[in-house]
């Protein structure tokens, strides 16, 4: 997987400039890399390390602490099923088993058509609304197997519009940036569409 694109390097430098220490920008830069590629590769982590002046191991240490970063290619829709204690007590294991049957893959896998990646993840901080899932970082609460089936039907038919981003994973950094960055997503989208 490639390094950050030239357009995203410009964005990265602007992000880094917002912090008193470059290292403080690691998380938004990881989101930026994930948005560009759909996941965070070793090469992109090494590039981020160069940009902020730390080792690749420090970047990986930060990224691996969080469930939101993926270290392998994912499908168009990445479905994270929370199986932490609150969700477990309210049916997460049954929901995960149902999701595996419905999609025809085990957790940690992607469907043959590249449409869905199913992940079993730890806490997504939605304990009061368990069982909860995320689809490309958009939360779904109190999900039943029937709700899951309806969601998959809508995603397959393309009926959710802007509610769920079109590709891979969504960089939250775009949700918290200024308008002058808004055009940069076009480059990242073109790169993802090309894969």
List where the protein language model places each region.
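Signature of N-terminal electron-transfer/Fe-S-associated modules in redox systems
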Residues: 1-195
């Amino acid at each position: 997987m490639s390094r950050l694109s030239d357009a995203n390097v410009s964005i990265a430098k602007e992000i880094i400039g917002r912090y008193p220490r470059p290292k403080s920008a690691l998380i938004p830069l990881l989101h930026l890399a994930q948005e560009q590629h759909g996941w965070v590769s070793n090469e992109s982590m090494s590039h981020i390390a160069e940009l902020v002046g730390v080792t690749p191991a420090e970047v990986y240490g930060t990224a691996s602490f969080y469930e939101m970063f993926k270290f392998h290619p994912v499908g168009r829709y990445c479905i994270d099923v929370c199986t932490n204690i609150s969700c477990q007590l309210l049916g997460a294991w049954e929901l995960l088993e149902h999701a595996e049957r419905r999609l025809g893959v085990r957790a940690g896998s992607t469907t043959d058509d590249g449409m869905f990646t199913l992940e079993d993840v730890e806490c997504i901080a939605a304990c009061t609304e368990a069982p909860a899932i995320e689809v490309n970082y958009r939360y779904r609460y109190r999900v039943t197997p029937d709700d899951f089936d309806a969601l998959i039907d809508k995603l397959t038919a393309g009926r959710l519009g802007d509610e769920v981003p079109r590709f891979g994973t969504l960089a939250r950094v775009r949700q918290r940036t200024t308008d002058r960055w808004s055009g940069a997503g076009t480059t990242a989208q073109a790169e993802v569409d090309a894969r």
